[in-house]
């Protein structure tokens, strides 16, 4: 006989499975951004192309150059990549079509000049 109470949690989200040490690294990216820009600046919206470019810079630094941490922020490059992926997911969930400037087969990327 168990002294533990009954809990019907089958099918519920398992937050306990997330690697918290890496979530903390992602939180450091958000914290750095809140100081460099302002809190919640990313929620104002960044174009998909700018997010993609930043994601690729961090991915390139980690993948091809073997760097682990960004020199400016001190944040792990993969945490920065995760930040931009979360931006994409948030903007898509929020229906921010105004930010979606992905190129298509018939329309090349636009210049940011």
Question: What do these predicted regions represent?
Answer:
Residues 1-113:
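Intrinsically disordered, low-complexity regulatory regions
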